[in-house]
């Protein structure tokens, strides 16, 4: 359910804005999206894992807040580009 360090570094290198960027909102959204995908797969198998389901909802809310921050700070174009890149729905447009 967690992300391996190699997968995390791969996501960081793919979504970073500049060299050495490991904590921008773009990178955080990418890491959160991967964690959400992992938990979703886990919940397909273990349908009654309510503790995990709550954790999933917390991660979804965190990602939504980060996406809203990106849209407000950087504009709709970069936000829509990130949403398309991550393969998630646009909830603010």
UniProtKB/Swiss-Prot annotation:
Q: Which InterPro entries match?
A: Ribosomal_uS15, Ribosomal_uS15_bac-type, uS15_NS1_RNA-bd_sf
Q: Name the SUPFAM superfamilies on file.
A: S15/NS1 RNA-binding domain (SSF47060)
Q: Does the keyword Ribosomal protein apply?
A: yes
The alphabetical list of record keywords is: Ribonucleoprotein, Ribosomal protein, RNA-binding, rRNA-binding
BP GO annotations: translation
Residue ranges annotated as coiled coil are none
The protein, known as: Small ribosomal subunit protein uS15
């Amino acid at each position: 359910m967690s992300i391996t360090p190699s997968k995390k570094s791969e996501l960081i290198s793919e979504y970073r804005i500049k060299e050495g960027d490991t904590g921008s909102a773009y990178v955080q959204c990418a890491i959160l999206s991967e964690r959400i995908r992992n938990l979703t797969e886990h919940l397909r198998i273990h349908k009654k894992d309510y503790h995990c389901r709550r954790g999933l909802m917390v991660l979804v809310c965190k990602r939504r807040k980060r996406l809203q921050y990106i849209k407000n700070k950087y504009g709709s174009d970069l936000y829509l580009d990130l949403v398309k890149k991550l393969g998630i729905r646009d909830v603010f447009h």
